[in-house]
């Protein structure tokens, strides 16, 4: 019990250190370090309303957008693209938006079926926000229900205009330089509660932040609409699939590094699922849960909406942290954004601006979660490395079985070590880190491996489930990061902050942040016995990525 308590205290000590550092980075406008933190260990929930706008301001998918269009439909019979614009009247679209929002807000158990006035104001504001987005992007994207749930998900962390950060009733619009007024620093009203039992409550009531810290907070760089628009551009991002296919000799591309459309993501998910969890894959595909029906709408929410509606708000926010914190090396931008004709690499700093001790708490092994041997050394996007196929061939050459230097066959390669040693080793080149470890694979592809990790974590439970229980799990995924949520809610409790001097000294001298489990594959699915963090899930996802890549290489070498 004493050991468990000490571990909990160390965990919360790390979270408090993280909150302090993020506030400092906000003051410095160090968006590169904020992005590194977001994608590797997540943004503290107390600070997402300030960090997310900064991350979105400098996000490559926002600066050079390309979203998945639902107004261009490919006609297979005519073998051409057909433009299908929104054919509903504006009022009908507004009613559709309100109908979808009411599914979240209205208490079905109530006799009145009418939300409270403040809830009603939030619903109207979110409707107007969505309509404003559609007015701007209507030629590319017409209304889908995902927009309503993305808006709701954002409102759970970011206050709508006219609430909290400026006086209510001020016309519903705030300037883009919104500050926390003195005396109201603890008033950041957001949506809280379970579905159909929603209240408007200060974010700091659920996730406390002491006044001495909240008084140091910076101005928010975007209002709610601007944050929403940019978030949608990231969630709905899609590479130019047609352009990519033209670069490949046979017209076929397998963009599991640079990213593909939702159809490709879904196909890749099931391929990895079959390889990683064959025992679970079989009953999944046998059940109607994965067929083209209403029961399969979880695929839409997992892949197109990036966890909106179906994930717990804390886990969904972690997924969005990964998306918003994604940053490739500036020199490789055009590999991931092959449609891009803008020059904005100068916006990103490649030099690490974190002290070594803190950096190795953020990146436990000095790498991005989704690193792979030699991938970070390749000049992606340069001649000869413009497509995923070319990159994979080069990686195979770098990680072959036979050592070209010694000529000794059967020498274990670095890839072999990555595939067989499931827990990531520390790479020697990263011991004295001077450069930021940038993202190496598309963020939506990263989510695929996180989803596989979720299924692996719950494999034993799912194997025992009936079809209806599997469907419920997929459409209402239970809270995964229990330790994160509990720790942040109790972060500044007296019991949490009253560490002994020995505990504090041990935590400060620790070179890595604590982990709740030695290995995620131990006690998989025992949700009631072990509390997990999203960091555990991300590390498992990275391990699955490297193991899957190893098997891909094995197949490629066998086919030669």
UniProtKB/Swiss-Prot annotation:
Compositionally biased spans, kind Polar residues: 412-423
GO cellular component: cytoplasm
Region (Disordered): 401-431, 497-519
Alphabetical list of InterPro entries matching this protein: Rab-GAP-TBC_dom (IPR000195), Rab-GAP_TBC_sf (IPR035969)
Coiled-coil ranges (or none): none
Record family assignment: Belongs to the OCA5 family.
Biased composition (Low complexity): 497-518
Annotated Rab-GAP TBC domain residues: 39-348
Keywords of the record: Cytoplasm
Top-level taxonomic group: Eukaryota
Main location: cytoplasm
Gene: OCA5
Keyword Magnesium: no
Compartment annotation: Cytoplasm
The protein's name: Oxidant-induced cell-cycle arrest protein 5
């Amino acid at each position: 019990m004493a050991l468990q308590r000490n571990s909990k205290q160390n965990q919360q000590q790390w979270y408090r250190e993280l909150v302090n550092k993020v506030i400092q980075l906000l003051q410095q406008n160090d968006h590169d370090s904020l992005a590194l933190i977001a994608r590797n260990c997540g943004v503290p929930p107390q600070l997402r309303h300030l960090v997310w706008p900064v991350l979105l301001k400098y996000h490559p998918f926002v600066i050079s957008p390309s979203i998945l269009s639902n107004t261009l439909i490919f006609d297979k019979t005519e073998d051409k693209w057909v433009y299908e614009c929104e054919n509903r009247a504006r009022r009908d679209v507004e009613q559709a938006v309100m109908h979808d929002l009411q599914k979240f807000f209205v208490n079905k158990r109530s006799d009145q079926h009418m939300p409270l006035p403040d809830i009603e104001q939030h619903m109207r504001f979110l409707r107007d926000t969505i309509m404003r987005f559609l007015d701007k992007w209507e030629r590319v994207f017409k209304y889908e229900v995902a927009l309503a749930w993305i808006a709701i998900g954002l409102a759970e962390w970011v206050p709508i205009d006219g609430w909290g950060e400026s006086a209510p009733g001020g016309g519903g619009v705030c300037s883009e330089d919104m500050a926390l007024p003195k005396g109201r620093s603890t008033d950041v009203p957001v949506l809280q509660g379970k579905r159909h039992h929603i209240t408007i409550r200060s974010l700091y009531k659920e996730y406390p932040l002491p006044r001495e810290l909240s008084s140091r907070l910076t101005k928010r760089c975007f209002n709610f609409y601007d944050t929403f628009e940019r978030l949608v551009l990231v969630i709905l991002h899609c590479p130019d699939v047609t352009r990519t296919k033209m670069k490949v000799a046979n017209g076929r591309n397998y963009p599991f590094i640079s990213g593909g459309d939702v159809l490709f993501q879904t196909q890749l998910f099931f391929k990895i699922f079959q390889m990683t969890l064959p025992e679970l894959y079989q009953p999944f595909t046998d059940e109607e849960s994965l067929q083209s029906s209403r029961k399969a709408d979880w695929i839409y929410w997992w892949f197109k909406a990036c966890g909106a509606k179906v994930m717990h708000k804390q886990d969904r926010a972690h997924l969005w942290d990964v998306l918003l914190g994604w940053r490739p090396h500036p020199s490789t931008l055009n590999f991931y954004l092959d449609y891009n004709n803008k020059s904005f690499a100068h916006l990103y700093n490649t030099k690490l601006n974190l002290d070594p001790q803190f950096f190795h708490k953020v990146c436990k092994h000095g790498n991005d979660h989704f690193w792979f041997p030699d991938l970070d050394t390749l000049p992606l996007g340069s001649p000869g490395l413009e497509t995923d196929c070319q990159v994979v061939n080069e990686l195979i050459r770098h990680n072959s079985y036979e050592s070209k230097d010694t000529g000794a066959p059967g020498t274990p390669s670095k890839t072999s070590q990555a595939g067989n040693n499931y827990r990531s080793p520390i790479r020697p080149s990263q011991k004295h880190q001077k450069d930021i470890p940038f993202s190496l694979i598309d963020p939506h592809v990263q989510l695929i491996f996180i989803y596989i990790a979720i299924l692996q974590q719950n494999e034993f439970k799912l194997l025992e489930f009936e079809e209806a229980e599997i469907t419920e799990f997929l459409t209402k995924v239970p809270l995964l990061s229990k330790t994160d949520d509990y720790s942040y809610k109790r972060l500044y409790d007296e019991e949490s902050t009253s560490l002994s001097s020995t505990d504090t000294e041990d935590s400060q001298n620790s070179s890595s942040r604590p982990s709740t489990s030695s290995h995620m594959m131990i006690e998989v699915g025992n949700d009631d016995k072990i509390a997990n963090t999203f960091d555990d899930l991300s590390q498992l996802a990275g391990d699955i990525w490297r193991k899957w890549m190893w098997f891909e290489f094995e197949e490629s070498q066998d086919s030669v």
